[in-house]
């Protein structure tokens, strides 16, 4: 059956339909309005004053049922001239439906009668028809009503949850969380809205649901990460609380109350697991929050979930972590101690504390391969810590008892091993095999003590005899006198004569061992002296052999004479080098040992100190340059400085000061430089010159060796030693008695000839380099050269000694020497020009004070530089070309 519900028809059409007796199909009918419920709803809404205002279309548009109804209404109104007939429109539609239904029932009645149904049956079937129609309409109504209630309830719950979440994250207005203003105002409660009248138009349930779905993405996207971090902190804190099992002093009362209201650890772990499983699924996450909204949104544990709450939670966790770490480290330390003691005792830990507790104790410190972000915590409560302490104390007591027992047994073993002279290999093997504190090791050590005691009973007499022999040997080594030995001998004889039992023999043996120990301590101090005495005796033997060999003249005629001489030279060097050191060290050691030993040391029946003095005198007599004198002199100087506290002032000669003997008259001394390090003084007698030969000579780069008898010297005033000074200052006269104190520093000759050239050349220039025509440089003749060679090889054997004889000839020869064209390398003479254009001669002087005494007056003869220079000068003189033959 089709019914027209679109709009009222014209009266003419309606009449035609009634007369025709058939159902008329209205071309403007809309299928969405083809139900009685819809029509009823439209009729009920016709009385609403807001109906026309809420219609979102204009009156003359024909796109929707409401548009058609409004258009037809105005059409009928203008045609009939009636007032507002909205109710009449819906009533006419229902009249048409009822008429169609009536006609349908009439036709159905005709069919029933033709079939032959009775009136009762026909009435029953009509009731069924009306009941079915009524139930169908009622079913649609109930479905719509249920949908309405469901949407209203879901929207209300989700809206309430979202608003509670915004309060938990400290954003009740949603400004920080929801960026869309329309969505934010659609889901917020009226008291949380920033714009109370928004939205102006009420939303349908489906529109509100769509707005809530959009808002859930923003709210849950901000809330779930915070909730996940907060749950992790809560779970960590719960683990720590369960491990420590007590409130710590660093927490406030509010913290303790909040901790007491936390859900159980299993509940928090389940919450975190559901959040991880629903990650990325808004539906599952929303369902999780709805199911657990009593704890998450209503409970005090989740009252505020933001960065500040997480930060505060981490501070509480830090307090518990510090306490846990302290206790955990203590447990680990005690665990290591327990394991070490059990290993030393050789006893399994399970037999002492039980298997369960042993497994729990072993679990501490063992890393577990877990993928969870939350660390694993071990129980460190007071009860567990006390149990571990009791276990450790028990093991320490057992360890101490066994260690003391082993120490006593090992002391007995050590004494017996020493007395019985057991080999070290056996002792090391035994101690290595019994290093633990197990009952088996203690039993083996006890058996070893018993075995050694049995051996001692059999060998104690021999041990006493060996100890007595060793004591006598040490007495001889330490040179003990009979008086020093007599005290112990008396005690020893008394104990030995009265010893009849094993205990008395042990007392005698112990007395001998104590004496041995005392003598060995003295021997330790005496060993360095023994070593020096041995060296002293060896050097004496070498000296005696050297004397005997030197007296045998036939050794020079033997075939291996060179080997004999080489051996003698090695012995001589060994004596001169090592004998002084041995003598000095031995004397020092003897002085140190005077307070430790009662009697003096003897050497070949004489006191060792006397033998040392005699030997030192012999060495000084035979080897004057030996180190004995030098070391003793040095030692004497050091002692004088320490005792008298006198500091000797030494004057060092520099380039601007020259050391000159006191009383020297420079006017009477004509000094001419012949070599860089040698000088002769003109105007001195031959005897005086012989004394001058003993003066110490200086070379550049060599040390200064002074005479043993030093005399006082002073520095000459600068006005006197100035090169250009020509004043009338009286120069000191030369004192012959003090000529030996002349310094070897070069002097500048202040008396110059008319045509003298300075500085004077030490060797003549060859004739082929000199222009003989008009040259003022004289030539060296054969006669003068021979005189020079004769003087250089005089009786003194010194090259630099000059005789006053034939003084004029020497002056003529000196005038014939020319200026050098180039100074040799390493020369002490440096020629420079002053700003006034005058030549200046600078003499470089290096005086080095020697800390050793001079032991030879011919030291310079062995100087390498001096010999080289001497050979050069002689070769140059031999290379002269003589013109006068």
From Swiss-Prot:
Residues 734-745 have a biased composition (Low complexity). Residues 1-30, 724-759, 789-812 are annotated as: Disordered. GO terms for molecular function: microtubule binding. The modification Phosphoserine is found at residue 17. The keyword Cytoplasm applies. GO terms for biological process: initial mitotic spindle pole body separation; microtubule bundle formation; microtubule cytoskeleton organization; mitotic spindle elongation; mitotic spindle midzone assembly; mitotic spindle organization; septum digestion after cytokinesis; spindle midzone assembly. Interacts with CDC48; the interaction is likely to result in CDC5 degradation. This is Anaphase spindle elongation protein. It comes from Saccharomyces cerevisiae (strain ATCC 204508 / S288c) (Baker's yeast).
């Amino acid at each position: 059956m089709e019914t027209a519900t679109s709009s009222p028809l014209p009266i003419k059409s309606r009449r035609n339909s009634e007369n025709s007796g058939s159902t008329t199909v209205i071309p403007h009918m809309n299928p969405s309005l083809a139900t009685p419920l819809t029509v009823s709803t439209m009729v009920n809404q016709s009385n609403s004053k807001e109906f026309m205002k809420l219609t979102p279309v204009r009156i003359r548009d024909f796109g929707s049922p409401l548009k058609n109804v409004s258009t037809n209404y105005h059409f009928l109104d203008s045609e009939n001239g009636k007032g507002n007939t909205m109710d009449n429109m819906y009533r006419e539609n229902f009249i048409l439906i009822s008429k169609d239904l009536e006609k349908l029932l009439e036709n159905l009645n005709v069919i029933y009668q033709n079939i032959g149904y009775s009136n009762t049956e026909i009435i029953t079937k009509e009731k069924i028809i009306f009941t079915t129609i009524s139930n169908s309409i009622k079913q649609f109504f109930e479905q719509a009503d249920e949908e309405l209630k469901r949407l209203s309830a879901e929207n209300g719950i989700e809206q309430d949850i979202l608003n509670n979440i915004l309060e938990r994250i400290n954003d009740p207005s949603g400004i920080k969380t929801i960026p869309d203003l329309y969505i934010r105002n659609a889901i917020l409660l009226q008291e949380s809205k920033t714009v109370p009248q928004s939205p102006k138009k009420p939303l349908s349930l489906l529109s509100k649901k769509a707005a809530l779905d959009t808002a859930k993405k923003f709210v849950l996207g901000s809330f779930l990460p915070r909730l996940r971090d907060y749950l992790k902190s809560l779970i960590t804190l719960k683990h720590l609380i369960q491990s420590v099992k007590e409130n710590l002093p660093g927490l406030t009362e509010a913290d303790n109350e909040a901790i007491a209201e936390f859900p159980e650890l299993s509940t928090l772990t389940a919450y975190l697991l559901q959040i991880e499983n629903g990650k990325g699924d808004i539906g599952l996450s929303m369902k999780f929050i709805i199911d657990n909204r009593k704890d998450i949104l209503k409970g005090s544990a989740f009252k505020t979930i933001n960065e500040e709450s997480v930060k505060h939670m981490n501070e509480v966790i830090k307090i518990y972590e510090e306490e846990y770490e302290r206790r955990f480290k203590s447990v680990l330390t005690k665990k290591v101690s327990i394991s070490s003691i059990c290993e030393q005792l050789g006893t399994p830990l399970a037999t002492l504390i039980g298997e369960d507790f042993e497994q729990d104790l072993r679990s501490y410190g063992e890393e577990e391969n877990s993928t969870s972000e939350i660390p694993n915590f071990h129980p460190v409560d007071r009860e567990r810590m006390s149990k571990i302490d009791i276990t450790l104390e028990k093991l320490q007591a057992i360890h101490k008892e066994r260690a003391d027992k082993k120490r006593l047994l090992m002391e007995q073993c050590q004494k017996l091993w020493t007395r019985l002279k057991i080999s070290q290999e056996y002792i090391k093997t035994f101690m290595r095999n019994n290093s633990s504190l197990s009952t088996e090791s203690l039993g083996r050590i006890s058996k070893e003590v018993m075995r050694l005691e049995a051996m001692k009973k059999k060998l104690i007499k021999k041990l006493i005899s060996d100890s007595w022999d060793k004591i006598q040997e040490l007495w001889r080594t330490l040179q003990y006198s009979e008086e020093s030995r007599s005290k112990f001998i008396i005690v020893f004889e008394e104990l030995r004569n009265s010893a009849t039992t094993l205990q008395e023999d042990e007392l005698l043996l112990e007395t001998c061992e104590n004496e041995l120990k005392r003598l060995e301590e003295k021997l330790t101090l005496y060993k360095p002296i023994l070593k020096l005495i041995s060296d002293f005796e060896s050097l004496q033997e070498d000296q005696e052999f050297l004397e005997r060999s030197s007296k045998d003249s036939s050794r020079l005629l033997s075939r291996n004479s060179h080997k004999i001489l080489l051996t003698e030279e090695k012995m001589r060097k060994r004596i001169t080098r090592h004998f002084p050191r041995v003598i000095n060290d031995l004397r020092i050691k003897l002085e140190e040992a005077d307070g430790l030993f009662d009697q003096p040391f003897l050497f070949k029946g004489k006191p060792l100190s006397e033998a040392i003095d005699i030997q030192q005198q012999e060495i000084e007599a035979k080897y004057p340059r030996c180190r004995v004198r030098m070391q003793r002199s040095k030692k004497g100087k050091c002692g004088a400085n320490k005792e008298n506290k006198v500091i000797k002032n030494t004057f060092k000669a520099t380039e601007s000061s020259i050391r000159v003997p006191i009383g020297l008259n420079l006017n009477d001394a004509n000094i001419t430089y012949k070599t860089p390090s040698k000088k002769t003084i003109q105007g001195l007698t031959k005897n005086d010159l012989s004394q001058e030969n003993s003066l110490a000579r200086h070379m550049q780069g060599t040390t200064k060796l002074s005479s043993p008898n030093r005399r006082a010297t002073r520095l000459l005033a600068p006005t006197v030693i100035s090169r250009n000074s020509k004043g009338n200052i009286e120069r000191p006269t030369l004192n012959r008695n003090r000529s030996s104190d002349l310094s070897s520093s070069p002097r500048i000759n202040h008396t110059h000839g008319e045509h003298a050239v300075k500085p004077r050349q030490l060797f003549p220039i060859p004739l082929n380099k000199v222009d003989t025509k008009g040259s003022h440089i004289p030539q060296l003749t054969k006669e003068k050269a021979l005189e020079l060679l004769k003087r250089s090889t005089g009786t003194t054997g010194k090259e630099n000694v000059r005789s006053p004889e034939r003084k004029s000839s020497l002056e003529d020869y000196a005038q014939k020497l020319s200026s050098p064209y180039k100074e040799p390398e390493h020369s002490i003479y440096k020629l420079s020009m002053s700003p006034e254009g005058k030549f200046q001669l600078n003499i470089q002087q290096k005086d080095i004070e020697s800390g050793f005494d001079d032991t030879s007056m011919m030291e310079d003869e062995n100087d390498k530089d001096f010999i080289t220079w001497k050979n050069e000068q002689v070769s140059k003189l031999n290379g002269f070309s003589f013109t006068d033959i």
